[in-house]
Amino acid sequence: MVGFAWLPPETNSLRMYLGAGSRPLLAAAGAWDGLAEELHAAASSFGSVTSELAGGAWQGPASAAMANAAGPYASWLTAAGAQAELAARQARAAAGAFEEALAGVVHPAVVQANRVRTWLLAVSNVFGQNAPAIAAMESTYEQMWAQDVAVMAGYHAASSAAAAQLASWQPALPNINLGVGNIGNLNVGNGNTGDYNLGNGNLGNANFGGGNGSAFHGQISSFNVGSGNIGNFNLGSGNGNVGIGPSSFNVGSGNIGNANVGGGNSGDNNFGFGNFGNANIGIGNAGPNMSSPAVPTPGNGNVGIGNGGNGNFGGGNTGNANIGLGNVGDGNVGFGNSGSYNFGFGNTGNNNIGIGLTGSNQIGFGGLNSGSGNIGFGNSGTGNIGFFNSGSGNFGVGNSGVTNTGVANSGNINTGFGNSGFINTGFGNALSVNTGFGNSGQANTGIGNAGDFNTGNFNGGIINTGSFNSGAFNSGSFNGGDANSGFLNSGLTNTGFANSGNINTGGFNAGNLNTGFGNTTDGLGENSGFGNAGSGNSGFNNSGRGNSGAQNVGNLQISGFANSGQSVTGYNNSVSVTSGFGNKGTGLFSGFMSGFGNTGFLQSGFGNLEANPDNNSATSGFGNSGKQDSGGFNSIDFVSGFFHR
């Protein structure tokens, strides 16, 4: 937060108004109060029960030993209750500091009005007649900047003072767990490896939930409220990626990066869904890569949906610092402009003010559209049908890409709205070949996936069939580990639930190679389960190496049921690098799919068929048989929409 002094009031004010606010702090204060009450009640009850036992019928050395052992626990509970009360008070103090700062910063609408007014004065300052008014607006803007910085400095000081009052928690008493299969101390639950966890199958400390952490490279994860996270201090599930690394301080699910609020974001400090980059507010924002359009770069600081670039406000813009819808270029204010620093609708060129102008530095009305072959109003591209399109071959409103059907798409061959990637069916997808909503990964079928090739929702990991997985190759949900068939596993290649160990068949195991429940030691043999042939397998009747689930045939990273290949999850898939149900491959280029009943290469969705796939095949949506299609029931190549035959 200390970087606020360098940030303009647009950023400081907007962050204060669009952030989570004081509600999480107040909720935390209430939770700490409740915990303090429970701890004090537990201490009182514990002391009363032990006193009655030792002073009643139970006498002798055993009774005395029990009383001596119980005393420290009662004292620890009392002290912990006092610390919880202090945490509640300081959380309320921090909430009060935020509310005071929120009241003190300039409202974002006031800042935006100042900037727009200044811009209008500047573009109309042909003879310098607006210079005094521009200077006055800039002076007001500088005052806004100073006001926000002063308020944020006070907020930082107050919140830091509140945090400084918190004392370190006293060491807990060792070797006390409530549950089975735990390795560590003071866990309430089963199958945890670590300390102070409330839940099942965690690898780390002080998690409230299950399946956090990953046994892959020993990625310990702590202080999460949720399940299936790789990282620390997340409020949600499925954040992080086993290959990219831990993600922390997220509020939401399926994010890769830090301090995101929402789902399926790749990057840091995003607010929304499916953003690829940093500090975006909205859905499906990313950055264009002009040298290789199929591989987008991160987009930063966008507010809106489906923008490809940086600092845009609106939807479907390609470029930087545009305000409006469907612009291509930089610094445009309006809709459907191609070029830079235009004000209006459907202009082609630079520094124009008006509608449908072609050229530069013009003012007026040039026609309903600029560009060629357009039907509608405010289009500046080529061959568009609709309104305010600056791209080519689009059907809809505010598209700056190519061959889109829908609204505010800055990518190409999308069906839907707010897609900045390629060949997506849905809305708010930042990368390519997704079917669904808010995916910043690629080739996903579902919602809020920042990873790739997932069938399900809010997966930060890759090639999962299920939801809220930060690991890879899982069939199930809430897994931080890899290649599991089941739920809440932070270990590897388990069939079952809440295992922090590896290659187990069952539940709540912190050891390895066990068949059963609640084991903290290692079993014997190369496999767990029943009827497996090979090594490193768990489950039932698998053949090969490194499989979990049942009746899988193959080597490495197969989970689920009746799959064959490599890196496969789900049910009855017969092609590698695939998640979902009943997907198949044909030809040399096959796999890399998600969804249901697809055949071919690089597909997502339902029932898509590419009979002769090659390395240019890519399809999303429903029932398509063409190449690089989005939408539904298309049989020709390179189209979006529906029923192109």
UniProtKB/Swiss-Prot annotation:
Organism superkingdom: Bacteria
Record-level GO BP terms: response to host immune response
InterPro entries, A to Z: Mycobac_pentapep, PPE_dom, PPE_sf
Disulfide bonds listed in the record: none
Gene3D superfamilies, per the entry: PPE superfamily
PANTHER family in the cross-refs: GLUTAMINE-RICH PROTEIN 2 (PTHR46766:SF1)
Protein name in the entry: Uncharacterized PPE family protein PPE12
